[in-house]
Amino acid sequence: MFNEIKDFAAPELDVYARTSEVQLLRYYEPEPGIFIAESPKVIERALNAGYQPISFLVEHKDLEGGAQEILKQYPDVPVYTAEYELLVKLTGFALTRGMLCAMRRNPLPSVEEICRNASRIAVLENVVNPTNIGAIFRSAAALHMLSLIHISEPTRLRC
């Protein structure tokens, strides 16, 4: 179902416009929260990995473009849509691929579960800059890493 954005203050748009990363992370506490995936390619990978969509935010022109196949698979998930300029105003940044998706986070596996069957693991310790994390994830994928462990508080990790 497509919903034309008419009211920027609509509460269903909060996750895209007025909720910080920390608030998204804790959205359903004590259960895992929400994350925002950007671009059809990233959204498709997340869906294939078992993450559940909550809603989509799609630029008008992409309703018939790259988003179309994904949206067909989830006809009951709300789709909020507007022209590019309105989406930039709503989100505060330029959508590079015309599509965002709010998704439920899955519970994180334990370090033991990750290490059990993985032969190639990359470990990030105290890396917090999103640009650096993105570059490292892309490099890990290029090097065929099977898992990536991100440790923001090394003293909390116990194997």
Language model feature labels by segment:
Residues 149-159:
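Single conserved hydrophobic/aromatic residue that forms the stacking wall/gate
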Residues 94, 98-118, 122:
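Acidic/glycine-rich phosphate/pyrophosphate-binding loops and surrounding catalytic core
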Residues 1-60:
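Boundary-proximal intrinsically disordered activation/regulatory segments immediately upstream
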Residues 5, 35, 125-126, 152:
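Glycine- and other small-residue-rich loops at beta-strand/loop junctions that grip anionic moieties
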Residues 65-76:
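Short, aromatic/basic amphipathic alpha-helical patches
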Residues 39, 128-136:
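Amphipathic alpha-helical repeat scaffolds
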Residues 41-43, 62-63, 85-87, 156:
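Alpha-helix capping/helix-boundary segments
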Residues 75-88:
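A glycine-rich helix N-cap at a beta->alpha junction
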